[in-house]
């Protein structure tokens, strides 16, 4: 547990090689950081350091950056799983130079309407880094496709192959994250 700059405790798990490229994983709602252990193990095998930040509705870009600052992380690849992807998009769009890549699971850019027609943030700027969106349904695929106009960098939309969630698609998700950590 860590205390954020906003004064609330949040679960944070930092593991992997200390000198590896950092991957920040923003957990989905009702998923403990331990739910990402199998994914983190694969990422560690690729030489990557992982920081999993638990879900909390009070978590803001300011508090997420505060966590990274306290851990000495100046830049990373950011991964967001569903509700965590909402924050990941915002971080990637508003903290230029802090993130080298974005992987979002089942969420499009905040300016794109979701399945219910709602737009999460009309004012969210475009993302200027390489981005991958993994999707589990045709509706999310449509939102991901529409998000491309808000990404000024390499952009991929990938169907989740497993049983339609990140936990059961660990190998595929790890592969997509490793691709985003590469500078090629």
Question: PLM features: residue spans?
Answer:
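Gly/Ala-rich beta-loop-alpha elbow adjacent to hydrolase catalytic centers
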Residues: 79-88
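Conserved HGGG/HGGXW glycine-rich cap/lid loop of the alpha/beta-hydrolase fold
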Residues: 13-57
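Post-His helix in hydrolase/transferase enzymes
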Residues: 162-182
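Conserved acidic catalytic loop of the alpha/beta-hydrolase fold
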Residues: 59-76
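Hydrolases whose catalytic domains are alpha/beta-hydrolase-1, hotdog thioesterase
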Residues: 87-91, 113
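A conserved short beta-strand
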Residues: 97-114
């Amino acid at each position: 547990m860590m205390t954020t700059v906003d004064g609330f405790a949040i679960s944070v798990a930092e593991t992997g090689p200390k000198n590896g490229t950092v991957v920040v994983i923003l957990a989905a709602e009702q998923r403990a950081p331990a739910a990402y252990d199998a994914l983190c193990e694969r990422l560690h095998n690729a030489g990557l350091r992982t920081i999993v930040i638990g879900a909390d509705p009070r978590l803001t870009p300011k508090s997420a950056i505060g966590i990274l600052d306290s851990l000495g992380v100046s830049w990373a690849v950011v991964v967001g799983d569903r509700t965590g992807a909402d924050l990941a998009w915002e971080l990637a769009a508003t903290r230029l130079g802090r993130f080298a890549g974005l992987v979002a699971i089942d969420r499009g850019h905040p300016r794109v309407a979701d399945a219910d027609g709602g737009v999460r943030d009309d004012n969210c700027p475009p993302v200027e880094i390489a981005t991958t969106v993994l999707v589990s349904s045709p509706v999310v695929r449509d939102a991901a496709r529409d998000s491309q106009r808000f990404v000024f960098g390499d952009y991929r939309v990938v169907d989740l192959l497993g049983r339609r969630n990140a936990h059961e698609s660990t190998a595929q998700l790890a592969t997509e994250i490793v691709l985003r950590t590469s500078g090629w």
